[in-house]
Amino acid sequence: MIIIDTALKKRQSLNNPIRVGMIGAGEMAKGMINQIEKYTPGMVVSATYNRTPERAKKVYDALGLTNYLITDDIIKANQAIADGKSVITGDVQTFLNLDKVEVVVESTGAIDFGAKIILEAFAHGKHVLSFNAELDSTLGPILLKKAKESNVKYALGDGDQPGVTMNLYRYVKGMGFDPLICGNVKGMLDYYRTPATQKGFAESWGMAPEMATNFADGTKVAFEQSCIANATGMRVAKRGMLAYESNDHIDNLTHLYDFDQLKAWGGIVEFIIGAKPSPGVFVYATTEDPYSIKYLDYGKLGKGPLYSFYVPYHLLFFDIASSISRLIDFDDPVIIPLDKPYVDVVATAKTDLNPGDTIDGIGGFKTYGLCDNHNEVRSANLLYMGLAEGCVVTKPVKKDSVLTYDDVVVPKGRLIDRLMVEQVSL
């Protein structure tokens, strides 16, 4: 993004950096802080909020960043930022009331907490860049509406699969081609992985076992592809997606899909297990223009009717700075939902569930997530994966059955349920 680094260098020369507030101090937040503070001119992390400030302190110390102040006092915090320091705080109101912070980055992966703090950020006039695909898939349309009502900006960031895919989708569409598949390349899939099975892997990478389980059991890819569908208006071919398996290169797999069916559907989101390049993303697109067809063949993309475009990786927090600059300086959100949902993620029993069982969170022992088309979700009264945590099962549910709202009692008084009621009416 050549135009972005030029804009950031100009900000640096004018001593007018974009001031970022970071929510959370996990692995992704750590990477973002490292990237912005060490390698991004024209941008600084002015504040980090974490419910336990000591964890944020450990992040700064591990990165060799020493110019910070730990405080919950708003006056001291504002002065520290004015003096060029970063602030670490465990008080959310102090964090949200900081004068100079203009954009907040939310990367917790939590639904209820994430929704609460994003809405509070909007109310305090802060723009929000989210790295929370789980929340955006579940409540993205209503969050975007709330942002517009508060005259602030909201978007998902680049670096994770939804943002990388949307960049590719726009690139392909900008050349006049018609995208018919937005796809994700997964290394493996096992719906029945749990925090117990993923404990060793999680520890080796410094992540929570639930996060590792979310990746392995298919829930994460479901949320990611739902975000893309909701930003493009695409659908899924069936509940759970087609999820073909192959060890071939993505360029050689267009034959797996029925072209006429793709055209009839108007485009789908998908994933392929085991293909190359992993962990990349791809767009299969078509064109009816004879001149384009001629030179796509000349460019070694084949004779169609499906042409393969791909990005061989997703670079996580390395792309965070460009995401922020695009949102703030260019009013160019990486990926935002359309006016309503098109694909949702529904809670599916990972094991037999019995009356009295309380459903644990995403990446837990009880459920995994599957994509389904929004109209089907609404007509069958299916339980959203993003709203399933804390629900109490009231009747037996067999393994691999999708839960409905008739199968559970929902906790009372949750903001996320009220937001869903609003979103359904959009």
For each predicted feature, which ranges?
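Short glycine/serine/threonine-rich phosphate/pyrophosphate-binding segments
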Residues: M28-M32, S107-K116, F131, S137-P141, ...
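C-terminal catalytic/substrate-binding lobe primarily of soluble NAD(P)-dependent oxidoreductases
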Residues: I2-R11, F201, W205-L426
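Rossmann-like NAD(P)H-binding beta-loop-alpha module
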Residues: A147-N151, A155-K220
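Rossmann-fold NAD(P)-binding glycine/threonine-rich loop
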Residues: D112-H124, N132-V152, D158-G159
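N-terminal glycine-/serine-/threonine-rich beta1-alpha1-beta2 phosphate-ribose binding loop
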Residues: M1-E120
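Short, ordered loop/turn segments at secondary-structure junctions
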Residues: A25, R51, Q93, G109-A110, ...
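Short gly/pro/ser/thr-enriched loop/turn and capping motifs at secondary-structure boundaries
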Residues: R55, L135-L144, Q161-T165, K186-D190, ...
